[in-house]
């Protein structure tokens, strides 16, 4: 089969044999690709350092039966240098990479929107000009939008009655009107759903002006909504929570939301 080229974000890697690695890539035109990078663990490898997680690359690959083979790599953006040396950026970036892999769908299914979103998010994390908690929640909301899971924020998730509505229920799909409100719905403080809308829409002025209590509440809702749809917890999110020192009430509320909506689902 013919070689092909594609732009990719390196999501993760693991050892194979004495000198090789298997890398998981989120490519622009071929979606999720798993490939063998031969000899990259040797000190004389030409492109081993370019295949670290967080790297944005132009790769040439040879199609294989189960795994493709990386034959050439050109670095486009070296985000890792600015991310891995800062624990907060690192845990935030890891949560983004794990989410990207989980939402990419079947291997080789084109994912240009998710690829573009992930590159932009990693660039923002590496730049460090915006709060990492807001960047992560914005990424998760927009990634869910690409997957078709974004919560309803401006209308009722069940009957589409225009909002704003105060109640929120994950299994119902987001905000719900008084007539559709299921048992067990939560009522976020005023401004929380507005903050979620601002993050989804890219209104950074409004998002960065929100109080920390609202930001913490949003993080809980966003994580619970995503993990309800994934039907399992992201391994990296607890690390992010520890970095931001989420208070006990936020952690308990997040666990309650996930548990409650798993039963409803």
UniProtKB/Swiss-Prot annotation:
Keyword Ubl conjugation: no
Record-level GO BP terms: DNA recombination; double-strand break repair
Keyword entries, A-Z: DNA damage, DNA recombination, DNA repair
SUPFAM superfamilies on file: ArfGap/RecO-like zinc finger, Nucleic acid-binding proteins
GO terms under cellular component: bacterial nucleoid
Listed InterPro entries: ARFGAP/RecO, DNA_rep/recomb_RecO_N, NA-bd_OB-fold, RecO, RecO_C
Family in the record: Belongs to the RecO family.
Function: Involved in DNA repair and RecF pathway recombination.
Protein's UniProt name: DNA repair protein RecO
Protein source organism: Mycobacterium ulcerans (strain Agy99)
Record lineage: Bacteria, Bacillati, Actinomycetota, Actinomycetes, Mycobacteriales
Protein's gene: recO
